[in-house]
Amino acid sequence: MTNDNPRTVIAQGTFDLLHPGHVHYLEEAAAMGDELYVIVARKSNVDHKKAPICSAAQRRDVVDALEVVDEAILGHEEDIFVPIERIDPDVIALGHDQHHDADAIEDELERRGIDCVVDRASGRESTREDEVLSTRLIIDRILERRDR
């Protein structure tokens, strides 16, 4: 039976140097609905950590290649809510460690007339001793090994 009203989910993030933690987040987000759209942050919107290494287009293309993702798009340069308004999701899935305040997002969504739930995905523990689940830690490991 086909669902005439598919449940649309948005996940968002920087997704620089894609790693298993990103994949876990996107798999959980996809499980929250029927269609998963991923908004990939532009460099101009990444102010809570160092700028991404890879270009926005490259990060979008890598995320878009994942089977669980229906469509990956670039975020808006100035207003992060513009693509959310266009997609009009049922759910916004936040990553377990993302800095966003769910209550503040819900307030802004309500102000803009967007009726959706904000949920937070769970974290993922390393399953192997050598597994790295953080872009920052991947970069640190690269720098450490290059200094040898």
Swiss-Prot record:
Biological process terms in GO annotation: FAD biosynthetic process; FMN metabolic process
Pathway per the UniProt entry: Cofactor biosynthesis; FAD biosynthesis; FAD from FMN: step 1/1
GO function terms (MF aspect): ATP binding; FMN adenylyltransferase activity
HAMAP family reported for this sequence: FAD_synth_arch
Enzymatic reactions: FMN + ATP + H(+) = FAD + diphosphate
EC number: 2.7.7.2
One Pfam family cited in the UniProt record for this chain: CTP_transf_like
Assembly and oligomerization: Homodimer.
PANTHER family: FAD SYNTHASE (PTHR43793:SF1)
Class of the enzyme per the UniProt entry, highest EC level: transferase
Residues at which ATP binds: T14, F15, H19, P20, G21, H22, D97
Cofactor: a divalent metal cation
Keyword Nucleotidyltransferase: yes
Keywords for the protein's UniProt record, in alphabetical order: ATP-binding, FAD, Flavoprotein, FMN, Nucleotide-binding, Nucleotidyltransferase, Transferase
Descriptive protein name: FAD synthase
Entry function: Catalyzes the transfer of the AMP portion of ATP to flavin mononucleotide (FMN) to produce flavin adenine dinucleotide (FAD) coenzyme.
Family the entry assigns: Belongs to the archaeal FAD synthase family.
InterPro entries found in the cross-reference section: Archaeal_FAD_synthase, Cyt_trans-like, FAD_synth_RibL, Rossmann-like_a/b/a_fold
Highest taxon of source: Archaea
